[in-house]
A protein has these predicted regions:
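N-terminal nicking endonuclease/strand-transfer module with a His-rich metal-binding environment
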Residues: 1-157
Length: 157
């Protein structure tokens, strides 16, 4: 279902979620951005995404849009979070969209998918691993909220 499997830290009601498709938890905590007119119940992510699913009439409707953005590796995690929040707020939340995001920075791996150190040797020590690809996964609702907190028609942008 539309990328929700990337965010396995919450459970949806059993509408179409498949826990067997989740990925290893290699990301930071999932963060939530809501417009000010969003119902208070949407602060609970499972309520939000179940509401998104229940708002659709068609069984094969697109429920969300996922965007992946690269982040400067020179920034700290806190700075990457702040930068991502500002981008989401100004670009999506300002027009009524609800968003979740998680920041990943997976280690560089060898051909057997084992993390490696700066000399190319397998390493399980996070202090020796190489991290070069910080990025954010942003999941957006397809429908913006109106001023009363009700779903509007889907956004075509």
């Amino acid at each position: 279902m539309c990328g929700l499997r990337r965010f396995p830290s919450f459970k949806l009601f059993p509408l179409s979620y498949n826990p067997n498709t989740t990925r290893p938890k290699t990301h930071s905590a999932i963060r939530h951005n809501l417009p000010p007119n969003a119902p208070d119940t949407f602060k609970d992510r499972s309520v939000l995404w179940n509401g998104v699913e229940l708002a659709e009439k068609s069984g094969n409707a697109q429920l969300a849009r996922e965007i992946e953005i690269a982040l400067p590796k020179e920034l700290t995690l806190e700075q990457q979070i702040a930068l991502t929040r500002v981008y989401i707020q100004q670009t999506f939340v300002a027009v009524g969209m609800c968003a979740d995001f998680a920041i990943h920075n997976p280690p560089v791996t060898d051909s057997k998918h084992r993390p490696i150190d700066s000399e190319g040797n397998p390493s399980n020590d996070p202090d020796k691993m190489i991290f070069r690809n910080p990025h954010a996964h942003i999941m957006l609702t397809m429908r913006p909220l109106d001023k009363q907190g009700q779903w509007q028609p889907k956004s075509q942008k």
